[in-house]
Amino acid sequence: MKKRTISLLLAALMLLTMLSACSGNSSAATTAAPAETTAAPVETAAETEAAAEMSYDELVELAKQDGKLVFYGANSYLQDAANNFAEEFGIEVEFTQLGETEMIEKIAAECKTGTPTADLVCAQDTYRVNTDLIGTGYAMNWTNSRITDITGETDCTAVIWQYDTKMFMYNPTLVGEDWAYNLWRITDPEYYGLFTFKAPTSEGVNLDMLTMLTSDTYAEKLAEAYKEYYGKDITLTTDNAGWEFVKMMYENGVLLTSSDSTCATTIGDVNLDKTWMGYFSTQRYSTQEAKGIKLAYDYNKATPFAGYTYPVYAVVLNGCQHENAAKLFAEWLLSENGYKAFETYFGGFSANPANAYATSYSFDDVKPYLVQDDADYLMDARVEMEDFLDSIQ
């Protein structure tokens, strides 16, 4: 009896399935099915999205209908980019320059209300972009195959449009070139109190850099460089040579400032009787003549690395008022005209390698000598670095 009941149920189910397959809209029901059928190709989600993607001209037209773009950023050069965008497309642009920490906090507060004032933010703190904007759902998830063709990234939630750099620099007035040949000199008691950089508490990318030093890759390089400088293996009081470097740097009288500009003028004073080192934006190197200071760095000679490189993101915000203008701006920043405002920005490189740069070397030239950003590691370790710094200051 039980088997018969199951058989009846299966038969009924098969009948329903057949009826369902034959049914559909009314016009389809009146059309006789051919004796042989060919299965329709299954379209992937990516293919569906690609087919639905608007062309560049369509995006431009919709952006013009938006009529306005409001965005925040930390780099003053973005004002020139805003002006160029407005001139090219006839779209009103409202740009506000804010410090990175203040900017992220402002954006997060606006997005929490569901109606952000800004449409887009140009941010550089990888950790905060991931935790405060992407992780919270405030960043819009979208794709653009034209951007993918340039950057290789299929996800436009945070479009990388530039790579910026910071370098360990020194004043060559008393010592000449190649003086900063090994970063452990920063920790040497002979040079106590002669190193400066912007306080990590007010500069997220500096906190990111310190965190990256503790990853296995860079900690191993620091351990090797320690032996080269001090002539012996490093004795650890922390987990690895990266943590040890940060600890010894702070113990050696580091001067924390409020800006990269202050760092540059502090170490670059031509009247100093001792040689200072500093870590700050590479762009400051190009301002030394105007400021009457002396700066030097040796990117391909410093051990174990010469500085740090980090991405700059264009993030379109969910709930923004001018979505298409924001998407157009993010894409446009990768174009020749979009990056024109940064052609003289010393130490910055477009994520589009075809665009111009101000240094005598390319990004591919300098990248092997720099600590590089790793979002996954930063997500795992940055909070620990924050706690560590609190414990040693």
Located regions from the model:
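Short, low-complexity disordered leader/linker segments with a strong preference
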Residues: 1-66, 393
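Short, polar/charged alpha-helical segment
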Residues: 53-64, 72-92, 168, 289, ...
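Extracytoplasmic ligand-binding site segments that recognize negatively charged/polar headgroups
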Residues: 72-83, 94-108, 116-268
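Periplasmic-binding protein-like
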Residues: 150, 163-166, 245-249, 291-318
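Mature extracytoplasmic/periplasmic domains
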Residues: 307-373
